[in-house]
Amino acid sequence: MQSVDTTKYIIYADITADGIVERPDVVGAIFGQTEGLLGSDLDLRDLQKTGRLGRIDVQISSSGGKSMGTISIPSSFDKVETAILAAALETIDRVGPCMARIHVTKIEDVRAAKRKYIIDRAKRILVEMFDENLLETEQITEEIKQSVRVEEITYIGKDNLPAGPNVLDSDAILVVEGRADVLNLLKYGIKNAVAVGGTNIPPTITELCSKKIATAFTDGDRGGELIVKELLQVADIDYVARAPEGKCVEELTQKEIIRALRQKIPVEQVMDMYKIKPFTRKKREIVTKRKSLIRERPVSVRTVAQVVPIAHHAEIAPPHEIQTRVHQKEVHEHYEEPEIEGQEPEEWFKHHVEELDGTLTARLFDRNNNPIRDVAVRDLARELKESNGSVHGVIFDGVITQRLLDIAAEKGLDYLIGAKMGSIAKTPVGIKVITSGQ
């Protein structure tokens, strides 16, 4: 009897006979008519006894005086010997007293079928049996990370607000919604975040925002928008950053967090967008706060003719975590009101101002005052940085901020026309600054 484990190929053949024959007749004809045909090495009876040939399976039926059926023979020989045996079957021309014809239809490679089974089964094993162990490893890693983050989190003020360890010592803070947001920022090395703990803004937040440069960093949903609106009315917020639409700060990746903080919007522009009454403060007080915080830092001072960039407000922990270097440049000791160009805008200015009103869109112009393209106001700073000298003027439906002025001066723009004037510490020389209300 042929062992299933040693079978390499299975020979399949069809048989037809001009008369009534049965299985024993077919098997007898196979053994009888191939005996001595291929020599002693390929004698079917001897091969079956030694296990090189399997059991000959015959399925046959009779109808209308004729018999038809199939034959299958397992073989453990290699391809050449198996092909010889298959060809020998087709030499059989008689079964019992009847004329017969045998035709080999195919030779199946059993090992190929086994290989296919092995591949399919290995895939299932990989998914089903290794998945559980992988999850356990991830859970252990996450538990360790969570433990470290929980140890770093502190609670400040009378309200016991969850905060990063650097909130009290830092001159810039991130105001987020909840404890989970603080933990996620700690995960990526941002240690100057403090949570408000809901829409009811506690006094500790108001006090911190009055002393530090504060950036509100909220979820990209309706709840985040409501918190921003309340913060603007009760706290001295300087910038607003939002998570991508539909996402929460606690679930953001490192890349998404950095992108959101880089795209923060000055508070003046946000207040204009929401059309709400802001937290009461004078323009001079805003500038004084920011300048005093800058002077408190032990940084080397170097003179810069026109550009006064604003530092990043997310403190990143060194060195194994994200590093954000803050470069500070000289700021004038005394606040000076910006000298705004007092001339009436030309007619073509007015046309573009009216066209952009209420769209929160910026229009870039070339040297000949021809429009280049329109961009969203939130992307204006990035577009100017990447302009490479092609942009010579901008008209936009937004607030003219110190950051935009600095970038415009750095890129050599001739004019900057906005809807409103924000908190400006210094107007660069050589650039016309006009508001649409002039």
UniProtKB/Swiss-Prot annotation:
> Quick one: which residues bind Mg(2+) 2?
D219, D221
**Which residues does the record give as Mg(2+) 1 binding sites?**
E177, D219
Q: Do you know which SUPFAM superfamilies this protein is assigned to?
A: DNA primase core
**Gene Ontology CC terms, in alphabetical order:** cytoplasm; DNA-directed RNA polymerase complex; exosome (RNase complex); primosome complex
Please give the superkingdom of this protein's source.
Archaea
- Name the reaction it catalyses: ssDNA + n NTP = ssDNA/pppN(pN)n-1 hybrid + (n-1) diphosphate
Q: Which Pfam families match?
A: Toprim_4
EC annotation from Swiss-Prot or TrEMBL = 2.7.7.101
* InterPro entries with a match to the protein in the record: DnaG_primase, Primase_DnaG_arc, TOPRIM_DnaG/twinkle, TOPRIM_dom
Which cofactors does this protein require? Mg(2+)
GO MF assignments: DNA-directed RNA polymerase activity; metal ion binding; poly(A) binding
- Tell me, what does this protein do in biology? RNA polymerase that catalyzes the synthesis of short RNA molecules used as primers for DNA polymerase during DNA replication. Also part of the exosome, which is a complex involved in RNA degradation. Acts as a poly(A)-binding protein that enhances the interaction between heteromeric, adenine-rich transcripts and the exosome.
Q: Which HAMAP family match?
A: DNA_primase_DnaG_arc (MF_00007)
Q: Known PANTHER family for this protein?
A: DNA PRIMASE
- Report what the protein is called: DNA primase DnaG
**Organism, scientific name:** Methanothrix thermoacetophila (strain DSM 6194 / JCM 14653 / NBRC 101360 / PT) (Methanosaeta thermophila)
